């Protein structure tokens, strides 16, 4: 039985949220604060984190929050923690953090208590940082609350401050010829809000990187590129894979039949555009990709559980399929979106 999140919060709540964002935004540090950030080869960086939230299909309440820590530069998972959570707030464009960040903060706190030696030195977040309606996206929110350096990595352009996914923007994307190529995202205000990054030689779709907390944009972009074995940075990619697998296992333990499970164990599908009314409007489920910079589930195919090592070994010796975020494609028992 599907669960539905609460209705749109009253305007008083949205006003309080805006005030909280403004208060926390004053604490954002958009410069390098760590010695490893100032080293061209990131000497001293050993642990990179990634976070993600996956949804039970057709259910806007039940979700899985996941935190992984990878060794650097090997990009091997050394820690993972996934938890089923109940989302109390609905999705409202521009306020994603109030829906998801509390659960991510809890995962960081659990890691600090259980394995403090494995605390990440930087966290890559599936979403935006200062590239946001009010300059304080989910990556900023998580960074300020945990005091960890954070990077926002989005797969869709958030169209704010005059940024548009128009013909000119598409022309700039075409000029990104190789992995590591970039162009700045300059708003109408003249502010550089982030960078478009071609993350992989075989991917034509850029990522949109922005500062979250305690890191400069230049270092954030360079590190994001260094973490990309495929299109999606490995910390976020692994958090996504493992959160989906955790949902599958959990549904199986609850006695959901495989035929039902395949319809419910993927990223929650999201509308194709911002809800009518623009930023701040309510979406029934999930996050419209153009609103918060996350892609639809079609770009996030899940591999077969237990297949990760074999897949990585195969890919290390073969060419990568163009624009595939999580290669190989989903097995037959995992439903792909229409």
UniProtKB/Swiss-Prot annotation:
Mg(2+) binds at residues 52, 126. Its main location: cytoplasm. Residues 260-270, 287-323 have a biased composition (Basic and acidic residues). CDD domains: Endonuclease_V (cd06559). It comes from the Eukaryota. Its EC number is 3.1.26.-. It is found in: Cytoplasm; Nucleus, Nucleolus; Cytoplasm, Stress granule. Highest levels detected in liver with high levels also found in heart, kidney and testis. Expressed at low levels in brain. Pfam families: Endonuclease_5. The keyword Translocase does not apply. Residues 253-338 are annotated as: Disordered. Its cofactor is Mg(2+). The record marks 91 as: Interaction with target DNA. Signal peptide: none annotated. Endoribonuclease that specifically cleaves inosine-containing RNAs: cleaves RNA at the second phosphodiester bond 3' to inosine. Active against both single-stranded and double-stranded RNAs. Has strong preference for single-stranded RNAs (ssRNAs) toward double-stranded RNAs (dsRNAs). Cleaves mRNAs and tRNAs containing inosine. Also able to cleave structure-specific dsRNA substrates containing the specific sites 5'-IIUI-3' and 5'-UIUU-3'. Monomer. Interacts with PABPC1; the interaction is RNA-dependent and stimulates ENDOV activity. Belongs to the endonuclease V family. This is Endonuclease V. It comes from Mus musculus (Mouse). The gene is Endov.
């Amino acid at each position: 039985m599907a669960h539905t999140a609460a209705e749109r919060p009253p305007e008083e709540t949205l006003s309080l949220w805006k005030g909280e964002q403004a208060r926390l935004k004053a604490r954002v540090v958009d410069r390098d604060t760590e010695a490893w950030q100032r080293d061209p080869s990131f000497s001293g960086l050993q642990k990179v984190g990634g976070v993600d939230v996956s949804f039970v299909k057709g259910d806007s309440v039940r979700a899985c929050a996941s935190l992984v820590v990878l060794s650097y530069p090997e990009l091997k998972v050394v820690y993972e923690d996934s938890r089923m959570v109940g989302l109390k707030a609905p999705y409202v464009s521009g306020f994603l953090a109030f829906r998801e960040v509390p659960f991510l903060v809890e995962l960081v706190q659990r890691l600090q208590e259980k394995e403090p030696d494995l605390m990440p030195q930087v966290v890559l977040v599936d979403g935006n940082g200062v590239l946001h309606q009010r300059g304080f996206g989910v990556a900023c929110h998580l960074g300020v609350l945990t005091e960890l350096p954070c990077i926002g990595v989005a797969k869709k352009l958030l169209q704010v401050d005059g940024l548009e996914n128009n013909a000119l923007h598409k022309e700039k994307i075409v000029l990104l010829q190789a992995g590591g190529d970039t162009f700045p995202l300059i708003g109408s205000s003249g502010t550089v809000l982030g960078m478009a990054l071609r993350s992989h030689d075989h991917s034509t779709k850029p990522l949109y990187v922005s500062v979250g907390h305690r890191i400069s944009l230049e270092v954030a972009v360079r590190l994001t590129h260094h973490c990309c074995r495929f299109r999606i940075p490995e910390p976020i990619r692994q958090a996504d894979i493992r959160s989906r697998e955790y949902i599958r296992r959990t549904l199986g333990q609850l006695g959901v039949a495989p035929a039902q499970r395949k319809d419910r164990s993927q990223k929650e599908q999201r509308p194709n555009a911002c809800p009518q009314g623009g930023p701040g409007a309510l979406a029934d489920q999930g996050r419209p990709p153009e609103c918060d910079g996350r892609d639809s589930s079609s770009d996030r195919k899940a591999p077969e559980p237990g297949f990760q090592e074999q897949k990585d070994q195969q890919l290390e010796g073969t060419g990568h399929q163009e624009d595939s975020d999580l290669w190989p494609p989903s097995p037959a028992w995992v439903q792909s979106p229409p």
